[in-house]
Amino acid sequence: TLLDGPHLIKTYIESGGTILELIKDVSIESDEINLIIQNNPNVKIHIIQHSLFVKISDLSSVTGLIALINIPSSNFIKPHGLSLLLDRIQDPGNLGGIIRTAAAVGVNSVFLSKECNDIWSPKTLRGSQGAHFFLTCYEQQNLEHLIELFEFPVYALNMKGESLYKEDLPKNVAIILGSEGQGVSRNLLDKSTKKITIPMTQGIESLNVGAAASIVMYEYYRQFQSDVTV
């Protein structure tokens, strides 16, 4: 996949990642770009015209540097602490924001259903600001089957659930977050241990999934912050 921009590339390198090739816009210079090139002398670099660079980049603002990398593989590690199950989340901005917050609060694992947006797409990577590199993410998962394998409670975020703020969350727990339009699927709701909701004032039916995810994750962090490593 492609990492667009020196900040994202720098974050990837700091996480221990290896760059395969670099693509540089001949018309753009910066200290940050030059430092990345200088620190990676063995990486092949393609210097191309601006008109070609903008065709490769998906971003509206040109960054000047793109890196080609292999998508990191995640070996399965038995989940513990807080895990997220993401059900059919399509918006790359929401998905990237959720992953960024998950890394910030020390989430152990993120499992994504087959219908979720590609977490390694340029827009999702941009939204996460490279948080992918510090998390264990599993794509293309059958969440219904996965729930049956978990040895701890699985909570689903749902409007008809019990208040999140009245809940003593388990130390080891998975929380399901549903798609922007439909929420958590009926099959996953039926398989969940408990349904929880975020209290809201009258007239507001739901929150953006990214905002809801942040509230849930930070409530877990609040309850267990002395035990969470960030």
Predicted region positions:
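N-terminal positively charged helical leader segments and presequences
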Residues: 1-58, 229-230
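Amphipathic alpha-helical repeat scaffolds
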Residues: 5, 91-94, 98, 207-212
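RNA substrate-binding interface of SAM-dependent RNA methyltransferases
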Residues: 14, 68, 76-162
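Short, acidic/turn-prone active-site loops that include or flank metal/cofactor-
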Residues: 27-28, 50-52, 115-117, 180-182, ...
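Short, hinge-like loop/turn segments at secondary-structure boundaries
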Residues: 38-40, 65, 127-131, 172-175
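Structured adenosyl-cofactor binding patch, chiefly the S-adenosyl-L-methionine
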Residues: 103-105, 116-119, 124-133, 186-230
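Active-site/ligand-binding-proximal alpha/beta "capping" segment
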Residues: 155-204
